Regions:
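Short, extreme N-terminal segment that most often corresponds to the first beta-strand
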Residues: 1-21, 145-146
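Acidic, low-complexity, intrinsically disordered interaction modules
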Residues: 25-152
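N-terminal targeting leader peptides, primarily classical Sec-type signal peptides for secretion
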Residues: 6, 152-154
């Protein structure tokens, strides 16, 4: 199977520029376009907390967030709009945050819009980075399920 052909076809299906940027950043963080990344990591990802290469440690996820903040925020805004919610309310509803009294609306807003501060917001940054991984993985899984694998043979 030609994995680059698989990835290129998936990207071509997604005409949303910010999603494409986020997807490419996620795949790069996972290790690049190869069979392990695409078929094992993206296809099998159900929960980003399960420990995927590049998304295990706060230092990795905070750096990923800082480098890709604008495209992740843009994608989160689009999802919030789809849900008919404002961005911060949607984020507060994430499983990691909804029952955590320490994660306030103000803390989320600060993590989104204040200057990067890994020490103060690392847990929130970690969740934002893992949101990106799960969003890309979910879209890839849905797309891959509809594909005829023989189209991607060498």
């Amino acid at each position: 199977m030609n994995i680059q052909k698989v990835w290129d076809a998936f990207i071509k299906e997604n005409d949303n520029t910010s999603f494409v940027e986020m997807a490419n950043a996620v795949v790069e963080q996972l290790g690049g376009v190869d069979e392990d990344t695409i078929l094992n990591s993206l296809y099998s990802c159900r929960n980003a907390n399960d420990g995927y290469t590049g998304f295990c440690y706060f230092s990795e996820t905070s750096k990923f967030w800082n480098e890709n903040k604008s495209v992740i925020i843009e994608n989160m805004h689009e999802l919030a709009d789809d849900f008919g919610e404002d961005l911060i309310t949607m984020i507060k509803g994430f499983n990691n945050f909804k029952d955590d009294e320490d994660i306030t609306y103000d803390a989320i807003g600060k993590a989104l819009y204040a200057p990067f501060d890994e020490n103060e917001s690392r847990y929130i940054y970690d969740t934002f980075a893992k949101y990106a991984l799960e969003e890309v993985a979910n879209r890839f899984q849905y797309w891959w399920y509809e594909q005829d694998e023989s189209e991607f043979d060498d």
